[in-house]
Amino acid sequence: FGVMPKTSGCSPADFAHVYDRIHAERPDATILHLAYSEVTTCSHQSSKIAAAGRDYVFSMDTRFVSVGQSLVAVETAKYIEAHPDATVDEIFAFTNTVMDRVLLGFVPTDLAFLKAGGRLSNVAFLGAHLLKIKPCIEVTGGKFVATKKFRGSMLKCARAFIDHMVAKGEIDYSHIGLAYSVGLSEELRADMEVYAHELGFK
């Protein structure tokens, strides 16, 4: 695989630097940090450490990553715009209701990275590769959980994945977030957008 990319969570000093800069520019502002799932990174803990002694900073674990975290942040921002006098407790109470409604999952096009990361045995990798099996990974309680297996081409599996997520309950069709990684075919990406519209998503 060549050189595997690595990540590291932000340190308390990183957060303190940003919080102090914002506070210097806008001393009357309250900072609300909607954090990446704390199960997957140390960032939320670092934020809480940095918030100590800074009574204008509040940090909350969104229990999501990527598009899920973004959706929680965007909906919270809309609430604040509509309710400018809301307290932090009221805002976070609303944020919790958003988190309870967000669904997030993905289907990897290639299991090689799961294998390289130690999340898949050689036998399981070989069997899944030969049978064209692709797992559905969902974010549940902040954790990555394999919930279902799809079989066939990536196009077929991607559509089955969307059907699986839509079947989970009452869906808000006003918006959907589709995230793609580098290397995904334009054909597959275009098909997912068309299929989402066919299902009624705006």
Label the model's feature ranges:
Residues 1-16, 20:
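N-terminal glycine-rich anion-binding loop in soluble enzyme alpha/beta folds
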Residues 2, 20, 25, 29-30, ...:
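Mixed-charge interfacial surface used for oligomerization/domain docking
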Residues 37:
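A short beta-strand-to-loop transition that corresponds to the Sensor-1 phosphate-sensing loop
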